[in-house]
């Protein structure tokens, strides 16, 4: 009986090992991510927030720039249809929070996409080529990283005025710098692997090695960093808008709404609470998802 129990345990462990070995990296990562309750709950909440910012302006009877002269600085009210209340100009806060969420999320996701594309290609090329080329590319990266970014944004706003496109350009210019440095470090360790040497011996071009062999092997790190980059970029855009360097009226972002709400929080606290609540919850969701992806893709846990 004891022997049978040991045999069954051995067979069970062996089958579990075969099951793990039979799964790919991404299948195993997905399984472990789905077991992370905080990450899954955050993903669900984030999807609900995304649906809200997309659908709320379409379903609402008010536009983001409509003025209700009879309901200026009105508290949240179910009967009037202003569920989040109105601002000092009589504009519906629910719609403005949704429109602001669209812009804030677009800025965060766009910055992450720029970081993924530009940073991954730049870092992998720099690390793979090495030598003087790597030194020159890294010095250029350090120069860009040391540039006073706030001064650059103020300069853009002074010459071209407040424009959401300028925010995309300004944030996109700095979002990829850290990504490139991280990918370069990963590439330096990958370029000594046997499969890279085999590709070199087989006559595969530099671009082919980078795109087909190096980039797929750094995607785990890239995905994790990109998921953690989105909330930092949203927060940075909110900071710019809070200072008055972001979106221009009548458009808004969560940062601009926070700035407006902070000026009247004593008499109209809902103007601060609703955009602040959405911003905080979104940032927490992205950070929990990033932590979940990091744990799921960590090779030490495989």
Swiss-Prot record:
Its main location: membrane. GO terms for biological process: oligopeptide import across plasma membrane; peptidoglycan-associated peptide transport; protein transport; tripeptide import across plasma membrane. It comes from the Bacteria. GO terms for cellular component: ATP-binding cassette (ABC) transporter complex, substrate-binding subunit-containing; membrane; plasma membrane. Residues 60-102, 161-163, 235-269 are periplasmic. InterPro entries: BP-dependent_transpt_permease, MetI-like, MetI-like_sf, OppC_N. SUPFAM superfamilies: MetI-like. It is found in: Cell inner membrane. It is a multi-pass membrane protein. GO terms for molecular function: peptidoglycan peptide transmembrane transporter activity. Residues 1-38, 124-137, 184-213, 291-302 are cytoplasmic. Pfam families: BPD_transp_1, OppC_N. PANTHER family: OLIGOPEPTIDE TRANSPORT SYSTEM PERMEASE PROTEIN APPC, OLIGOPEPTIDE TRANSPORT SYSTEM PERMEASE PROTEIN OPPC. Belongs to the binding-protein-dependent transport system permease family. OppBC subfamily. This is Oligopeptide transport system permease protein OppC.
């Amino acid at each position: 009986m004891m022997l049978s129990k040991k045999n069954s345990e051995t067979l069970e462990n062996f089958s579990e090992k075969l099951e793990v070995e039979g799964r790919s990296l991404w299948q195993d990562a997905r399984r472990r991510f789905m077991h992370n309750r905080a990450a899954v709950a955050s993903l669900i909440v984030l999807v609900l927030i995304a649906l809200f910012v997309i659908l709320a302006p379409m379903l609402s009877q008010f536009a983001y720039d409509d003025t209700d002269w009879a309901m200026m600085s009105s508290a949240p009210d179910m009967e009037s249809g202003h569920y989040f209340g109105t601002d000092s100009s009589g504009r519906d806060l629910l719609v403005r929070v949704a429109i602001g969420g669209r812009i804030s999320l677009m800025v965060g996701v766009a910055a992450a996409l720029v970081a993924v594309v530009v940073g991954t290609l730049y870092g992998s090329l720099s690390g793979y080529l090495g030598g003087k080329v790597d030194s020159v590319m890294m010095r250029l990266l350090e120069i860009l990283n040391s540039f006073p970014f706030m001064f650059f944004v103020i300069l853009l706003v002074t010459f071209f005025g407040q424009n959401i496109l300028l925010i995309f350009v300004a944030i996109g210019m700095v979002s990829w710098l850290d990504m490139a440095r991280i990918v370069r470090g990963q590439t330096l360790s990958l370029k000594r692997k046997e499969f890279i040497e085999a590709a070199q011996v087989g006559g595969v071009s530099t671009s082919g090695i980078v795109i087909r062999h190096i980039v797929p092997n750094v995607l785990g790190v890239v995905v994790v960093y990109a998921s953690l980059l989105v909330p930092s970029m949203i927060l940075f855009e909110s900071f710019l808008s809070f200072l008055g360097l972001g979106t221009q009226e009548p458009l808004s972002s969560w940062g601009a709404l926070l700035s407006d709400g902070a000026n009247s929080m004593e008499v109209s606290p809902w103007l601060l609470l609703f955009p602040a609540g959405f911003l905080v919850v979104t940032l927490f969701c992205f950070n929990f998802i990033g932590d979940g992806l990091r744990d799921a893709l960590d090779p030490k846990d495989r």
